[in-house]
Amino acid sequence: MANSGFLKLAEERYSCRAFENKPVPDELIDKILEAARLAPSAVNRQPVKVWVARRPEVLEKLATTTKYLFDAPLVFVVGGNPSQAWVSRHDGKNRAETDACIAATHLMMEIQDLGLGSCWVGSFDAAAVKALFPEEMEGWDIIALFPTGYPAAGPSERHAVRKSMEEFAGEL
Ligand SMILES: Cc1cc2nc3c(=O)[nH]c(=O)nc-3n(C[C@H](O)[C@H](O)[C@H](O)COP(=O)(O)O)c2cc1C
């Protein structure tokens, strides 16, 4: 039986690295942001922020910080704020990045569910991004960029490569 629901969505999602030259409607952007806003976070601290970049002059500036925006018409920038996050007393770990990654995953999967494409981009100059928007990003670590739009390419070869279930999962 074919999968449905979330598993189907997870199967169908891939890193999209080419986009149509077509804007994403505001109501879809709102849904994507809502999916990210609803993400869980440690002790519900919600130390996460998402910025929307779609104005051509902003996209041009962002493109100086990474090779991986693929001329997308829209980029989500996800930040985590360590001063707002929960810190475990067991190991002293600050969970800002964990919380930001959960919200980022919600965002990425909602993009997929809306029939759009995106790519989680971790290879960018975070200091350069912050230098472009110093007031907005004061206190925030920049965790990921998501170039987003209507897909104009399918998955790369890497998409099909996953560990076997035997390697991936185990019983204790
Ligand atoms: C934390 C993280 C950082 C990534 N950074 C980049 C990146 O900078 N550039 C890029 O093209 N893809 C990036 N990717 C996408 C991965 O290469 C991709 O998810 C992986 O190869 C599996 O392919 P798939 O997403 O198509 O299934 C990143 C993914 C993750 C989760």
Model-predicted segments: where are they?
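Acidic, surface-exposed loops and disordered segments
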Residues: 1-172
